[in-house]
Curated annotation (Swiss-Prot):
It comes from Mus musculus. It holds the Pfam family zf-C3HC4_3. Interacts with CPEB3 (via N-terminal domain); the interaction increases CPEB3 ubiquitination. Interacts with DLL1. This is E3 ubiquitin-protein ligase NEURL1. Disruption phenotype: According to PubMed:11585928, knockout male mice lacking Neurl1 are sterile due to a defect in axoneme organization in the spermatozoa that leads to compromised tail movement and sperm motility; knockout female mice lacking Neurl1 are defective in the final stages of mammary gland maturation during pregnancy. According to PubMed:11481456 knockout mice lacking Neurl1 are viable and morphologically normal but display an olfactory discrimination and are more sensitive to the effect of ethanol on motor coordination.
């Protein structure tokens, strides 16, 4: 019995003679990791206990991103300090290149934000050596896919903190609690339950609206200085009642809960949609790459309309039925698709959104110049074309609008084509405008992309592909508009008149051969007039332009504004 006891004792405590020389015995498992030991042994500072502050400082090796184990969408710079997600919203899991110390702050700077997605960074730790993880085995999401596996702990950063330029620091203490702070704010409890008896690598998922991050020099935080705020004192969107279970965040970090700023809509309380599913729906409605240079113009009509978030968000502060008109900061380009997301609607009710284009530079207008109703814009002398999105809209819906080289404004709704809505003059600079109605109280510009058509986008100044037509709301075709290209006596006949009346042109049907202007289509100025508009009888269009105009919603004659019921092609005798 004595021999057996001695054998067991030496196995648990290590050889006394070797211990006296500072060489405690290490036991390795099959992959080279230390065996876990009972928690009451950790105060003896055996080598398999995690590194702590008692070492006196940070390791000589700087904290970098692991060069090989990363998601398929991650692009990493040569210094291994900065990563960027190149497309989509997921497949962007990264790890640190070495284990972190207890109380070592992993410091990240957000370098790129893409507002078309929901959710933000997922931060945490893993006891699995990233060098032993094959990159192809990484799931799309840290939450819930990765944290559902043993040895991974992570949670979503509240979206309100995921702004470009913010510095996020997070760390784990000896009790397995994870804290974080934003910039120089107080420390806040993030989650708990991390197993600290094993080495821990940092885990960063560059998810959702966070597109790029940079690792800064890590720092040690002194336990005596930690006075974390209660998590309930923080205004954050991902608050949940947490138990002591290690991976409580498995099912909770993936819920789409509305942020305090309301930038992203959410379904009614009690019916949350997982952010992963929401983003998957959005990915079907959006291209892989979006340009982010398009903004809302500072001009807005409405006492309670605000332009927020670097002029990408237009918000109506009160739900009353009042004017809420906003414009793009620059003219849209031919074949440029503009993506707009409805990010807030009141009470889950459906709402409406008007949209259109104008040749009027918003910089030349004052809010007092704009009418209460967007439909009344047609009384102005500039070209205005306005209509409403067909069908109801809800929070989270994504609209795509594009003016093609033929002057047709097409609409898509959540990736599904809704057809041509307007026919406009693509030869002139066109600013896009939006008006919020009813329950729709906030929209966001997600970005834009150029869709090449038939070999590439056409030049916006080419008269050969410049249809000029009325809008779906019976817009008045003003005299300056008809003289856009300065060709023919038609433009000169009404030269500088202020077109507050529908037209100042002859209202009788025009027969071919009665003047030079009657030989050219008043839309394309290229083909000969060969079409009669029924029922008014005017002849001012070629057949191809007449067909396009007839397809427009509430199509009307460019001369007398009567509804177009049909078009009839005519043939001249030689």
């Amino acid at each position: 019995m004595g021999n057996n006891f001695s054998s067991v004792s030496s196995l648990q405590r290590g050889n006394p003679s070797r211990a006296s020389r500072g060489h405690p015995q290490n036991l390795k498992d099959s992959i080279g990791g230390s065996f876990p030991v009972p928690s009451h042994r950790c105060h003896h500072k055996q080598k398999h206990c995690p590194p702590t502050l008692s070492g006196g400082g940070l390791p000589a090796t700087p904290l970098l991103f692991h060069p090989h184990t990363k998601g398929s969408q991650i692009l990493m710079d040569l210094s291994h300090k900065a990563v960027k997600r190149q497309a989509s919203f997921c497949n962007a899991i990264t790890f640190s290149n070495r284990p972190v110390l207890i109380y070592e702050q992993v410091r990240l700077k957000i370098t790129k934000k893409q507002c078309c997605w929901s959710g933000a960074l997922r931060l945490g730790f893993t006891s699995k050596d990233p060098s032993r993880i094959h990159p192809d085995s990484l799931p799309k999401y840290a939450c819930p896919d990765l944290v559902s596996q043993s040895g991974f702990w992570a949670k979503a950063l509240p979206e309100e903190f995921a702004n470009e330029g913010n510095i996020i620091a997070f760390w784990v203490d000896k009790k397995g609690r994870v804290f974080y702070r934003i910039n120089e704010s107080a420390a806040m409890l993030f989650f708990s339950g991390v197993r600290t008896v094993d080495p821990l690598w940092a885990l960063v998922d560059v998810y959702g609206l966070t597109r790029g991050v940079q690792l800064l020099d890590s720092e040690l935080v002194l336990p005596d200085c930690l006075r974390p705020r209660s998590f309930t004192a923080l205004r954050r969107p991902s608050l949940r009642c947490e138990a002591d279970e290690a991976r409580l965040s498995v099912s909770l970090c993936d819920l789409n809960v509305p942020g305090a700023d309301g930038d992203d809509g959410a379904p009614p309380a009690g019916c949350p949609i997982p952010q992963n599913s929401l983003n998957s729906q959005h990915s079907r409605a959006l291209p892989a790459q979006l340009d982010g240079d398009l903004r809302f113009h500072a001009l807005r009509a409405g006492a309670h309309v605000r332009i927020l978030d670097e002029q990408t968000v237009a918000r109506l502060e009160h739900g009353r039925d009042e004017r809420a008109l906003v414009f793009t900061s620059r003219p849209v380009r031919v074949a440029e698709t503009i993506f707009i997301k409805v990010t807030r609607s009141g009470g889950g009710r459906a709402g409406a959104l008007s949209f259109g284009v104008t040749t009027c530079d918003p910089g030349t207008l004052r809010p007092a110049d704009l009418p209460f109703s967007p439909e009344a814009l047609v009384d102005r002398k500039e070209f205005w074309a306005v209509c409403r999105v067909p069908g109801p809209l809800h929070s989270g819906d994504i609209l795509g609008l594009v003016v093609n080289a033929d002057g047709e404004l097409h609409l898509s709704h959540n990736g599904a084509a809704a057809g041509m809505q307007l026919c406009v003059d693509a030869s002139q600079p066109l600013w896009m405008l939006f008006s919020l109605h009813g329950a729709i109280t906030q929209v966001r510009i997600l970005g834009s992309t150029i869709m090449t058509e038939r070999g590439g986008p056409s030049l916006p100044c080419s008269p050969a592909s410049t249809p000029t037509s009325p809008s779906a709301l019976g817009i008045r075709l003003s005299d300056p508009l008809l003289s856009t290209c300065g060709s023919g006596p038609l433009g000169g006949s009404a030269g500088g008149t202020a077109p507050n009346s529908p037209v100042s042109l002859p209202e009788s049907p025009v027969t071919p051969g009665l003047g030079q202007w009657s030989d050219e289509c008043t839309i394309c100025y290229e083909h000969a007039v060969d079409t009669v508009i029924y029922t008014c009888g005017h002849m001012c269009l070629c057949y191809s332009c007449g067909l396009r105009l007839k397809k427009a919603l509430h199509a009307c004659c460019p001369i007398c504004r009567r509804p177009i019921k049909d078009i009839i092609k005519t043939y001249r005798s030689s």
